[in-house]
C-alpha cells in the first residue's frame, strides 16, 4: 500500500515537473528573442538589462498564449469563405530571409511558383515585406510577390500578403474599406488564406502595393506617389521616396510646392497656397476618417502617403496602414499592470499633429469641413450600428479561416518595443467584443466633441449713434448666426474699425489654441496639440434698435453649424470697456454665401488673359457671342457653365490673331455638374498648363457629371493631344462634328455616357479613343483616321451601333481586356478593319469582340486577331481576310 502511494506521488511529481519544464521552455523561448532584440539596440547597457528583466513579464504572456493556441479547437468541416493563395517556395528561402534581420529580410527576391485563378502555375519572385520584426517571423511572414510582365496576377505585377496586426484582423482592412466608401484613395485589399508548400500558414490581407497599379485599380490616372516613412521634424523633399508615373514632374514638383506652402510665413496667402496644391476636400475626409477610427499611426515622422493627380492638379492623401479601431491605443507595458487591457477612447478630435495637419487646422474653413464630414460618417457610414452590422458580416466570412490559423499573432507594445504576441481563438472572440465596445464609446465621445459649441455675447452702447454686439464663439464646431430680424443695417467690424455690411445666415468659426499634449503621456510626438479655443466677433447694429427685443431675437439666432442643434447664447456682464485690439478676426472670417454669375456676350468678347470661374460661381455665354481668344489665353470654369447658342444665334470661340492659337476651354470639377454646350464652334485652340495641370484637350471636360453637348463643332486644334478630352465624367454628346484634329478627335478616359450622330473627319491619330470607359455609341461616322477609327482600351466596355468607319489605318482596335459589341456597322477601305490585341501587359490579355450584322468592304485585312482573343461573329457576317495567331467563332 505504501509503495503504491509512493509510486503515485512520484508520478504526480513527474507530471508536475514535466509541465513546469514545458512552461519554462515556452518562457525561455519567448524571452530569448526579446532579450536578443533589446541587446542589439543602441540603448545604454543598464537600460538593456532592466528592459530585459521587465520583458520576462511579456515572455510570460507570450508563453501562456502559445500554450493556449496549441489547445485551440476548430471545426475542420466548416466551409471556407475567402480565396486561397498557394505558393511553392524555394526550399530554405524563408529561413534565409530570417537569418540576419533586419538586413536579410529584404536584401533579395527568391524563386517561387504561384497558382493562378485559371489553375495554371507560373514562376514568381518573393521576399519579406514590412519595416518591423513583427512582419518577419518565419511562422507567418508578410510577403511581397513579384510576377513577370507576361503573367500579372489579377492585373498586378506586385502585390503584398500582409499578416494582420490586430487580434480581430480588421484594423487595416476595415479602415481601408471605410476609406473607399467615403471616397478616399486607398489600397484594394481582401482576405485570403495563404498556403506555402501545401501547408496552411494562416489568414492574410492581399493588398496592392504603393505604385501605379494601385492607382489603376482605383480607376485613377497614373501620377507621382510620395512616400514619407523616415521624415525629420522639418520635412524636406529628399526625405520622401517618389514612385509611380513622374511625367507631371516635367512641368512642376508638386511635393516641393506643398512643402513651400507648409513652411511659408503664416498668412491668408499661405493658406491659399496650401489649398492650391492640396485637395482640401480629400484632406478633410482623410482626417475625419482618422478621427473616426482613432488612427494615430500617421505622425510627424512616418506613414505619410500622397498622390498627385495630373487630371486635377492637386495632391491628395492615401489611406494606408491606418492601424485603426484602437490597435495603437492599448495600455503601455507599465500601464498593463494596473489597467484593463482595452484601447483608449478619448483621442482628441484633431489627433496626432504633424507639419501638414498643423497648417491645415489653422484654417477654420478646413476644420469646419472636416467636422462636417466626421458628423456625416458618425450618422451614416461610420455609425455604431452600421459598423457593427458590417463587422459582424465580415467576421462571419473570416471566422472559419481565423479559427484554424495556429500562427495568428498581434502587435503589442512590450518592454522592448512592439512585438508579435500569439493569441488563441478565445482571445479572438473576445477582441470582437472589445472592438464593438470601443466603436460605441468612440462615437459617443466624438458626437460630444462636435456638440461642443458655445456662444456668449455682450451688447454695448458706446455712443448715441452706435450699438455694438460682441459675440464670442468657443468650442470645436462652428456656429450659424442668423441675422434676420436684427434690422436692415448690420455690419461686421474688425480691429481697424473697418466695416462691412452683412445679412442673412453667416458662419462664425471658433478659435484654436496650442495646448499641452496630455493624452499621450511618455509618447511626445509634437510640442503641443491644437485644441478648441474662443474667437471674438464684433457687429454694429442700428442704434435705435430695442435692446430687450434684440436679446430676445439673439436667443434663437444661433445653431451648431455641424449638428444643426440650437445654441442658446449666454449674456455676459463684463463691465470692462471694449478693447478693439482684442478683436483679432478679419471681416473675411465671417463667411457669407455668394453665387456670382459671369456673363459673356452677346456680341464680340475679347479675352487677352485667362478667365477663371471659381467653385460656386457660374458662367453663361449668351447666344450670338463671338469669343476672341488671344495667344495662349484659356478659359477655365469650375462652376456650372452654359454655352447657350441657338441655331439662329450660334456661338464661336476662335483666335483673336489668326496665326496665334489660344489655349483651352475647360469645364472642371463637381460644382460644374449639369454644364451645357450647344450650338458652338470651337476652333484654333491648343493646350495649356493651368493650375498645376496640363490640359491635353483644346476642349476639356473633367470630373463633372451630366455634361451635355449638342449641335456643335470642334476643329482645327494644334499641339494638343486631343481636340475634345473627357475624363472622369458622365456625358451625352450628340449631333456634333469633329474635324482636322491634331491628335485624337475625342478621348474618353474613366468616363461613361452616350454619343449619338457624330461626324469625325481627318484625325491625325484616333477618331475616338476609349480608356477605362463605358460608352454607348450610335450613328457615328469616322473618316480618314490616321491611326484608329475607334480605339477601345484598358477594360473599356463599348457598344457601337449603326456606324461607319472608312479609310482609316485601323477601323476598330480592341485591347487590354476591353469588351466591344458592334452591330449594324460598315467598315470600308481600311488597312485593317478590326484588330484585337494586347498593348498594356498589366491587363493580361487582349479582350473580346462581338460582331453582329457588320459589313466588311474593300479592307486590306478584315480581322487581325491575337492569340487568346475572343471574337464572336453572328450569322450573316462575311469575313474575307484574317491575320494573326488567333481565331474566331461563329454564333448561330
Short names for language-model regions:
Residues 23-174:
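Conserved NTP-binding catalytic cores of kinases and kinase-like/nucleotidyltransferase enzymes
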Residues 158-167, 242-246, 271-278, 356-359:
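Second-shell loop/turn segments in exported
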Residues 182-193, 627-628:
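Short, well-structured beta-strand/strand-turn elements
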Residues 32-35, 119, 260-295, 299, ...:
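Middle-to-C-terminal accessory/interaction subdomains
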Residues 499-892:
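Beta-strand/loop edge motif enriched in small/polar residues
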Residues 477-497:
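Short acidic, flexible loop segments centered on an aromatic residue
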Residues 2-21:
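N-terminal Sec-pathway targeting helices
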